[in-house]
Curated annotation (Swiss-Prot):
PANTHER family: TYROSINE--TRNA LIGASE, MITOCHONDRIAL, TYROSYL-TRNA SYNTHETASE. Belongs to the class-I aminoacyl-tRNA synthetase family. TyrS type 1 subfamily. Pfam families: SYY_C-terminal, tRNA-synt_1b. SUPFAM superfamilies: Alpha-L RNA-binding motif, Nucleotidylyl transferase. The keyword Transferase does not apply. GO terms for biological process: tyrosyl-tRNA aminoacylation. The gene is tyrS. PROSITE patterns: AA_TRNA_LIGASE_I, S4. It is found in: Cytoplasm. It comes from Corynebacterium diphtheriae (strain ATCC 700971 / NCTC 13129 / Biotype gravis). This is Tyrosine--tRNA ligase. It comes from the Bacteria. NCBIfam families: tyrS. L-tyrosine binds at Y33, Y167, Q171.
Amino acid sequence: MNIIDELQWRGLINQSTDIDALREACEKPITLYCGFDPTGDSLHAGHLVPMIMLRRFQEAGHRPITLAGGATGFIGDPRDVGERSMLSQDTIEHNLESIKKQLRSFVRFDGDSPAIMVNNADWTMSMSVVDFLRDVGKNFSLNTMLDRETVKRRLETDGISYTEFSYMLLQANDFVQLNREYDCVLQIGGGDQWGNIVSGVDLNRRVSGTKTHALTVPLVTDAQGQKFGKSTGGGKLWLDPEKTSAYSWYQYFLNAGDSVVIDYLRWFTFLTQEEIAELETEVRERPHLRAAQRRLAQEMTDLVHGHDATVSVELAAQALFGRASLQDLDEATLDGALSETVIFEVPAGESPTIIDLLIGAGLVDSKGAARRTIKEGGAYVNNERIESEDWQPTDDVLLHGAWLVLRKGKKNFAGVKYSA
C-alpha cells in the first residue's frame, strides 16, 4: 500500500498540496522532514502525530529528516495571542540536547532509510541580513504574508513584531536548504503550520523551479474538544518521564473517551486496519470493558516509555486497587502512581494513628467518619485492612522506607510520605 493511502484510511491528512502528485512521488523512496523548535526542554503529546508520521514514512521505505530549530527557536513561531518570551542561548542549547534525545527514540538512524538529524542554526546563523533579504525576502509578497491566519488574528488584537512576522521566511528557507542538500521534497507538520509549510513549497519553486510537497496532520482534541495533551492536572502531557510519569501517561490514554479512542488508535498506533476494526466493535458493543482504551494506553506507553514501563504501570494500577502487591513496585513507579493522588506528608518524628492519616489525607472529614470507616472494614494501608483505631505504622510497613498507600473502600486512595 502506498504510504499516502495508508495515511488516508487513518485520517491523518488534514491538508496537502496536490495529493495525486504526492502519491505518485511516494511510489519511490523520498526524503521528507519535520521541524521541532526547542521552546522547552521536552516535547509533549501535541508533537506526537508528526513524530509518529516520520516513523510511518520510514517504515514505508522513505528517509526522514528531523530538524531541530536551533535558529528558529530564538525567534518563536507566532502564536494566536501574545509574543513569545525570548530564550537565552544557554536555554536553547540545553533544550536542543534534550529534544534530540527524544527524537532519536522515534526514528531509526541506522539500517534501511536511516534518518538524518539537522539543526537549522547551521545555515541560518551564517547568513547575513543582506543575503537573507535578497535571497529569501524578495520572493515573498507582503500581501500573502499578511493573509496568514495567525498573522491576521494577531493584527486584530495586540499586533505582531517584525521578528515573529519573519518566522515563516526562516522556515521556508529551511525547506530550500534541505531540498538542495538532501533532495528533500516533502515537509510535514501540525495543522497550524500550513501557512509556513506552503511558504517553503513556494520558495523552492521560485528559487529553483523544484516541485515540493506539503502535508499537515489533523488538530487532535480530547472528548471535550480541548487541545490534546493536557494532563489531568491542567499542564502539558510531556514525553519526559521526569515531567510526566509513565503512570500518568498511561492513565491519560486509558481515560480517553469512547468518541475519540478509535481516532487515537488510527493516529497514534501502528495497529492494522483489521485490529482497529475489532476494537471499534468492542467500543460499540461492550464499551464498559474499555478494551480499546486499554490497548491504546499499552501501545502509547510502549512507544514513549518502553514495554517494561508499561508492565510496571499496569502492575501499579492493579496494586493501588488491591489486586497486586505494592511491595513489587519500584520506587519510581510508586512515586509516579501516587503523583495523581493527594499526598499527606508526615513530619519527621511524628507517629499519627490511622484516624489521623485518614483525616490528613482527606479521605474522611472527621474522627467520627474515620472510626465508622474502620468499623465497617473500609480502611486499608498498603492493601491490608486496618481494624484498630489505635493502629500506627512501624518502619517495616513503609514502602521504600518512606511511603504508605492509604485506601478508603475500593476506589478512594491517597499517598502518605514520611519525612526522613
